[in-house]
Structures are given as C-alpha cells and as structure tokens.
Amino acid sequence: MVATKFTLKYSSNIGFATDQGGRGFQLPAHIAVRSDNRIFVASRGRGPTVGVQMVSRDFEFFGKIGSQGKATGQMIEPSAIAFDSVENLYVADEKLNRITRFDYEGEVIDSWGEAGSEPGQFDHPTGLLIRDEIVFVVDALNNRIQKYTTSGDFIDQWGGQGSSRDSLKYPWGITGAANGDIFVADWGNDRVIRFTEDGQFVSDIHKGQGAELPLNRPADVAVDQDDNLFVADWGNQVLQVFDENGNFLDMKRGEADLNPWALQYFESQQDEKRARSSYVPVFETNTDDVREVSARIEPFFWDPCSVALDENGSVYVLETCRHRFQIFDRV
C-alpha cells in the first residue's frame, strides 16, 4: 500500500469551560469519534459536568451519558472511552477503577473492575481499545496492559514497571493498527511503543527521524489506515505526527479561535468580552516553560491529553485546561 501524503489544516474548535452542565466541558480527559462522526468527550470536574458529553463538529450538543456518583452507570473521573463493533460505549473511570458498558442509546449494560494489583483489578485505568470483542485496558499505575472479554472476563496481561523495551512506566493512551498491532503512549518513558496484540515488543519512538523535539510525556496516540501516528505530546504541548517507520511528518502547536459557543457566551457577558479584547499576555516567568506559554496564548494547546480520528481522517485534539478540542482536516 502506498501511503497518502497529506498536510493538516486547522478547521475549528469546540468547547468552553462550564460547571453548570449542558454544552461545554470541565477538565475533559478523553475524546472518541463514533462511526457516524458523533463526538464523545469524557468530562470531569464536578457535579453536572461529570459524564460523557456528545456533540457534532457543527456545534450541536446532544446531551451526556452518566452522572456524578458511585452507583452503576455513574462516574467520578471518567478517563477513557471506546466503542465496540455494535457501537456499545465503554467508559473507564480511574477513580472508581472500573469499566462501564453502555448501549447505543446510552443505557447501562454492565460494569466491572475493582481497585488492586491482581489480574482483573485496576489502579487508575486510563486507556481503552476494543478489537474483535477483546477489550484492552491501560492500567496506568500498575504499569501494564490487561485484556478482557467485552463482559469483563480477564484474559491476559503484559508490561511491568521499567524502562526496558517491553516495560512500561505510567502508560496512558492506546490505539490499534490495521494489522492488529497496538500502540501505547508510555508516558513515563517519553515514548510510544508498538506491540503485537499479545504484548510482544515490535518497535518504539522517542524522537522521530527529522523531528525537532523528542517526545515528552506523550499522553495519547491515534493511528490512521496508513499507520501514521498522531501523538498528543503533553510535555511539549504539541501534536506530533510520524509515519509507520517513525519518521517525523508534522507538528501542530494549536491555532484555535473563538468558537460559536464561546462567542454566544461573550455576547451575554460584555464586561468579560471587553477585558478579553484588551488582554495582552505578560510573561513573568521563564518562557522556556511551554506549559506557561500555553496557559497565556489562547490559540495554543494547553495540556493536550487525547487525540482521535474520524472516518474522514480529520484529527481531534483535546485540551484539558482549555476545556475544548481543536479539529484539523487533511488537505
């Protein structure tokens, strides 16, 4: 197969901070796009913002799944979301250490998991991948990947804390290639590792050939049909793109403008609108601190924590601290 050449062009962004519920997010942790291109965002924060918000890239808000709490179907810190072959939604909660399965309409089917370090237990599950009715769970603080049936029966695990080629240190995101291989964002080791679906090491990327920056605390990874990798590089506050051989292709820092939700908010808050229009960033700290720069330059990514692709290959980058995601289309 000949890989299709592309560049990424900024399209739009969706979201703004809210603690009132309804449209908007608070400290979102993960993003996924269903086959019909409906966008699902795991929103945390507190109270009415906790759950999985559903939106379209046309700024439609469809409501949310789940609510704050510990009962079945509720959430405290939803950390990862994924879909199976019949579009059931799976939600990992790193506070409750469990996985909950919802049907297409958002009704609870079942949940499973508990805190611990034994097989079948979790310590902060942060990533989900579902393939051929197998659920792969990134068990972050146990430094391992676990495999389950869709009903929650334990199958296998691999990993273990360390920096060797087949070890993990606080892994975060996960995705799958077309040939069955699996990519894991190995946050603590500043790399993305490629495994077979049985956990055998294939390769890794620390710094792609031609890249300006080595990976620094990668939070999540997505892969397209040509095995190009899209990495939410949390430590560098960028999106990095590599080909299947680890060659650097592109890097994005963020280009967001005010989206319609934010514009509508400012129309009702004229004092804030005037203050924003006259704001000039002042750096009183070391500007080599990329997070400090991100915090003060609104178009930039501020803590990019998750990345997803839709059926057309568009790229969605979720930012925890700006409570939004930016969309880039291929051209």
Feature names for model-found ranges:
Residues 1-331:
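Eukaryotic scaffold repeat domains enriched in small/polar residues
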